[in-house]
């Protein structure tokens, strides 16, 4: 965002990534997931699918939400809370290329986070490595929660092997819960018949993001971004804020459109920003099929693979010029698989 735009509207910082806007839904979701990790009784109210506890006490947990809803910040705060409480050891898989993550890589992550040694030695022999892992858990004497971000990119074979990893730890006297964080594609993939072995054991939490608090979020993010002595009403009319709240769903969308509105308003000297400027920057394609699928974690490759379609067919479907019969066929298949259409 240009500094001259920020000066014109009295912004101390761009209205993106301004911090954590906590709602009761955020707090309840955090409590529910923490309860699931600790293995305490009672299904959580936000639980989309009640998975079972795996033999030995470990759990498979999934936290899913659309792009830009704040699940990464929620996950980060949850990890910090668990570390502060000290009842659970928190581990993370940091590998960037999630599609190439395998169980040995996850075991390596556990070694690095659980080992008291500065120089961690991991055996190249699988039998020795797995026995050493069991010994690490026995020494830890606490449950462990392994967090995996962008889990919608994990290979199906890796997903199905997570159950065996939890059982391996349990057989050695330890307790491991695995928390997968990803887009709604992850939830839908877990419901596919070929994923039944792990899907039926997964506790899925669907994070609703702001829910109906978009208007409150706009006020909050403006107050967090504006300089001293500048109020939200000085830079954005009430009608303009209400229109943004009605059209947008996530903090990421709101932040991006506020930036666009300020930049467009600066060009014409509009202060405060009114509904005319807001309408000009709102995309008419915001709720088209392609952006909806993208927000849920689907790209061209994943759609081609899942629905046995040709890339050209998917491109034409997204453009709206695929023949009606094939369009109905693909959209019916997508709806049946849980995709937003």
Where are these regions (language model features)?
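Conserved catalytic network of the ASCE P-loop NTPase/AAA+ motor domain
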Residues: 38-39, 52-56, 83-86, 136-140, ...
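Conserved AAA+ ATPase "SRH/arginine-finger" region at the nucleotide-binding site
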Residues: 95-97, 203-215
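Sensor-1/coupling segment of RecA-like P-loop NTPase cores
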Residues: 43, 56, 62-68, 124-128, ...
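AAA+/P-loop NTPase substrate/partner-engagement loops
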Residues: 83-109
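C-terminal alpha-helical "lid" subdomain
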Residues: 227, 231-341
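Mid-core helix/loop region of P-loop NTP-binding domains shared across ATPases and GTPases
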Residues: 101-109, 116-161, 170-173, 234-243, ...
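P-loop NTPase Walker A phosphate-binding motif
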Residues: 64-89
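A short, basic N-terminal segment
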Residues: 1-58, 340-341
